Design a protein with these regions (language model features):
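Conserved catalytic/switch belt of AAA+ P-loop NTPases
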Residues: 42-93
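Short glycine-rich substrate-engagement loop in P-loop NTPases that contacts/grips substrate
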Residues: 2-31
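C-terminal helical "lid" of AAA+/P-loop NTPase domains
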Residues: 147-169
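Short loop/turn elements that form and flank the Walker-type P-loop nucleotide-binding site
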Residues: 30-33, 66-70, 146
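Flexible beta-alpha connector loops of hexameric P-loop NTPases
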Residues: 9-20, 43-54, 99-101
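Conserved C-terminal "switch" segment of AAA+ ATPases
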Residues: 81-87, 102-145, 164-171
Length: 176
């Protein structure tokens, strides 16, 4: 098959007792023969009272052990929450024993991403410098939740929102 399935907590956790195991097994069975990617997997464990999330974890662990020759499971998230997540079940660390830490992008790389998401816009030299300065400042002030390309996309969406607001204000002036 060689297919790819990406899921999050909502795709695995049910709405009532017993529903989570069924829902999780459906996803796991669909992933057989392919790759299952669970983004922000630590969201399955939202605290000590999260029985539904724990039910999903307890369904995943034996399933991937029994089917390790027929699927690849990749879990992703920020480093610290991932380490905490891997401690929630004794079988997790041994089943996910390869870790890849991606370095954050530098200013030039973030600017290339910005150019990609804003390809339909033209930026003059002054604006380009301001954008690069903003991206550089974003890196200098980042915290453990820094979103790299996601933060660049959000930055661009914010620029578009402000542009739309200015155009609306301008059209109000012209109409009057």
């Amino acid at each position: 098959k060689g297919h790819f399935i990406e899921v999050k907590r909502d795709d695995l956790v049910g709405e009532y007792q017993g529903h989570t195991a069924v829902k999780t097994k459906e996803v796991l069975n669909k992933a057989l023969g392919g790759v299952l990617f669970i983004d922000e997997v630590y969201s399955l464990r939202n605290g000590a009272g999260d029985d539904f999330g724990m039910e999903a974890i307890n369904t995943i662990v034996p399933f991937i052990e029994d089917n390790r020759q027929n699927m690849i499971v990749v879990i992703a998230g920020y480093s610290q929450p991932m380490n905490e997540f891997l401690s929630t079940n004794p079988g997790l660390k041994s089943r996910f024993n390869t870790t890849i830490d991606f370095e954050d992008y530098n200013t030039d790389e973030l600017y290339e991403i910005f150019k990609g998401v804003s390809k339909d816009f033209n930026w003059n030299e002054t604006t380009t410098k301001k954008i690069k300065d903003y991206l550089s400042n974003m890196i200098m002030n980042k915290d453990e939740n820094f979103g790299n390309a996601r933060d660049v996309r959000k930055f661009f969406e914010n620029i578009k929102k402000h542009q739309i607001n200015r155009l609306v204000e301008y059209s109000d002036l012209v109409d009057n």
